Amino acid sequence: MINLNDVSYKYNDTAAQAIQHISLSVKKGELVVITGKSGCGKTTLFRCVNGLCPRFYEGEITGSLTLNGKVLSSMRICDISNIAASVFQNPESQFFTTDVLSDLVYPCENCGIEKEEIQERLHRVTKLLSLEPLLNRKLSELSGGEKQKIAIASVLMLDTRVVLMDEPSSNLDYQSVELLTQILAQLKSKGYTLLIIEHRLHYLAELCDRLIVMENGSIVREYEKDLLCTIGNDEFHKQGLRGLHLFQNNSNTLITPQRQHTDKRLLTLHDIHFGYRKNTEVLKGIHLSIYPGDKIALIGKNGCGKTTLGKILCGLKKEQSGTVLLDGRSFPARVRSKTAGYVMQNVDFQLFGCSVYDDLLLGNEALPDKENRIQTVLEKLSLSALQEQHPTTLSMGQKQRLVVAASFLQNKRLTIFDEPTSGLDYGSMQNVCALIDSITGKTNASVIITHDYEFILNTCNRAVLLEDGQIKEDFQLNGSMQLEYIFKERL
């Protein structure tokens, strides 16, 4: 169904080959997973298969690529999309309307499908993904995970026999990942061909027929299904990759030491309320105390209000009622950005420079010893070799590391990280863990909005569960048992 023979690709605006000498065959009905460190060429391979390289992302391609027996270079994009549908890493990049319902039916309308058939598909896909509560919502109101679901649903509306997915689980809560697993199993049982680019492998371990590892633009290892069940997490971690078993204990996963006990509060939230629409509250009386040294994992289902709470903490949103105190004194929204930093879920919103280096220099021109600090953080996050590249040419994982690096230079008393590891391999995740630990220290605090179980165990010393607009659990991370229970039963 998908055949690549000695395929190489180089973008026009970069000197190095993005992928080189890729030979790969995916048979009809197979589910093949491609993984590898951030920036290894996975997304470029994805773009070559769906025709966006070189038609949209300009560059030079060599070798041959066929899709369903047809030479890809001779096909129009519209012909390719009739065979293969794509779920992109950033779901917002494939939205064409402003509301959920319109966006779901748009692909079918664009292909001239009859109204009755569109309605039948809409009913089937909505039921499959449990989207009924979202149908009348605006896309701008959705959480990152909800947007991810809509992107997946719009692709399923096309009912193509080949489905390509780039990091489909990156913004999803645990139950939504379980649902995605069931959907992929259904598609596979019906003979769909699935090619999935992914860092988080645990939900695919039982489904995939082959796991392919890329490194520096090339395929370096391939694991057959029978072999995967015999491999522990440590072997993958040694390669800088995520493990296959989410809740398996391993030698590299450590519970972060608890912060030293102190009665001095850094930030206090009392009875915080907020809603985007009249008579619909997202936050319903939030009470939270944040202490120096806290590295808080803010967890909860998609759409529960985690990002909204994060934006209130840093002043991007103003609470509709309630009190926020800093060091026991009133802390109005208009001045919070001076003390609180924010790393957004969509990192493209925070990239402004013409190069990686310029992006870190921006706003830090007066920073003492700025050159040494910039080079140090570039080295810590393995970005030194990329410092002259334009930020838009980076992979999603590299972009995430860049905005985390910028937050390190700002050195705010409180930093909110919104899904900082969604595009990161295991090695990069550990580097980010170390940097957040350095940012927090003993005097600052960090709040990390995340669904990443491995990351929480490696980084956080406290977890807060947001549920039904209120904080329902708040506990120190002394071990993984309580966190594992919450992931399995309440996320």
UniProtKB/Swiss-Prot annotation:
What SMART domains does the entry give?
AAA
Q: Name its cellular compartments.
A: Cell inner membrane
Q: Work out whether the entry's keyword set contains Repeat.
A: yes
- Check the record and name the SUPFAM superfamilies matching this protein: P-loop containing nucleoside triphosphate hydrolases
Classify the protein's membrane topology as the record does. Answer: Peripheral membrane protein
Keywords in alphabetical order, please: ATP-binding, Cell inner membrane, Cell membrane, Membrane, Nucleotide-binding, Repeat, Translocase, Transport
PROSITE patterns linked to this entry: ABC_TRANSPORTER_1, ABC_TRANSPORTER_2
Record-annotated residues binding ATP 1?
Answer: 36-43
Please verify whether the record's keywords include Membrane.
yes
In short, the EC number is 7.-.-.-
Pfam families attached here? ABC_tran
- Binding positions for ATP 2? 300-307
ABC transporter domain location, by residue?
2-241, 267-491
Signal sequence residues: none
Q: Which residues form a coiled coil?
A: none
Primary localization class, coarse: membrane
Q: Which GO terms describe its cellular component?
A: ATP-binding cassette (ABC) transporter complex
In alphabetical order, the GO MF annotations are:
ATP binding; ATP hydrolysis activity; ATPase-coupled transmembrane transporter activity
Family designation = Belongs to the ABC transporter superfamily.
Q: Which PANTHER family match?
A: ABC TRANSPORTER ATP-BINDING COMPONENT, HEAVY METAL TRANSPORTER
Q: What does this protein do?
A: Probably part of an ABC transporter complex. Responsible for energy coupling to the transport system.
Name recorded for this polypeptide: Putative ABC transporter ATP-binding protein TDE_0906
Q: Which organism is it from?
A: Treponema denticola (strain ATCC 35405 / DSM 14222 / CIP 103919 / JCM 8153 / KCTC 15104)
Q: What is the lineage of its organism?
A: Bacteria, Pseudomonadati, Spirochaetota, Spirochaetia, Spirochaetales
